[in-house]
Design a protein with these regions (language model features):
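Beta-propeller blade termini and top-face loops
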Residues: 1-191
Length: 191
């Protein structure tokens, strides 16, 4: 929190989602959503022209920004939000740029370790979690599968229908996240 030494009514509060400004001593604050601030975790692009840039943000949603707009300047209205919560890895389907997978943490539906599939055509998000278990409050030793805050997510370069996700094991899906198979042993040294 910064308080202007010459005018204590002017304050700036910074957080990992952005910054909020008050001109009345904290009675009201400007939103973080009207300022160009963000902390990005990961970026990706799709293969269309014009292309879209995707980013996952700390304490905000993920965002998809087009590289061009019909009207010149790219506005917030041109953007879309392919994932919710505090997001980690993001992967755009290599053959269908309308399909985006986003690892989401925190306020995501499904809780910690959620994996979401977004369709630009319908603007709908569907949960495609690797393992349907809420991890909040469970000791790691009691969990069958464990995922980090931002777990890896990538399409196979040799097969665009194969998606991999990393937890204490590597998982593979060949049906758009409808089902997952563990394909590695426990990689965590039994933590």
């Amino acid at each position: 929190l910064w308080i202007d030494p010459k005018n204590p009514q002017r304050m700036i509060e910074g957080n990992d989602g952005g910054a909020c400004v008050s001109f009345n001593g904290g009675a009201s604050w400007a939103s973080i959503y009207n300022q160009k601030t963000a902390q990005f975790y990961r970026l990706d692009v799709d293969n269309q022209h014009p292309y879209r840039v995707y980013g996952t943000q700390q304490d905000n949603t993920s965002i998809s920004v087009p590289s061009a707009s019909e009207w010149g300047a790219i506005t917030l209205g041109d953007c879309s939000y392919p994932g919710t919560g505090e997001s980690g890895f993001i992967a755009v389907h290599p053959q269908d740029p309308n399909i985006v997978y986003c690892g989401a943490i925190g306020s995501s539906p499904g809780g910690a370790g959620a994996l979401q599939r977004y369709d630009h055509r319908t603007r709908q998000i569907r949960l495609v979690n690797v393992w349907p278990e809420e991890s909040t409050g469970i000791a790691p030793k009691d969990m069958k599968y464990r995922f980090a805050w931002t777990f890896p997510l990538v399409f196979a370069p040799s097969d665009p229908k194969t998606l991999y996700a990393g937890g204490n094991r590597v998982f593979r899906s060949t049906d758009e996240g409808a089902s997952w198979t563990a394909i590695s042993p426990d990689l965590s040294l039994n933590d």
